[in-house]
Amino acid sequence: GGSSGLISMPRV
């Protein structure tokens, strides 16, 4: 799970 700019990635 990490965020970069306006894109967020859930821990899946």
Swiss-Prot record:
One of its GO terms (cellular component) is extracellular region. Abdominal perisympathetic organs. Keywords: Amidation, Neuropeptide, Secreted. Its main location: secreted. Signal peptide: none annotated. Pfam families: Periviscerokin (PF08259). It comes from the Eukaryota. GO terms for biological process: neuropeptide signaling pathway. It is found in: Secreted. Transmembrane segments: none annotated. The modification Valine amide is found at V12. InterPro entries: Periviscerokinin (IPR013231). Mediates visceral muscle contractile activity (myotropic activity). Belongs to the periviscerokinin family. This is Periviscerokinin-2.1. It comes from Pseudoderopeltis foveolata (Cockroach).
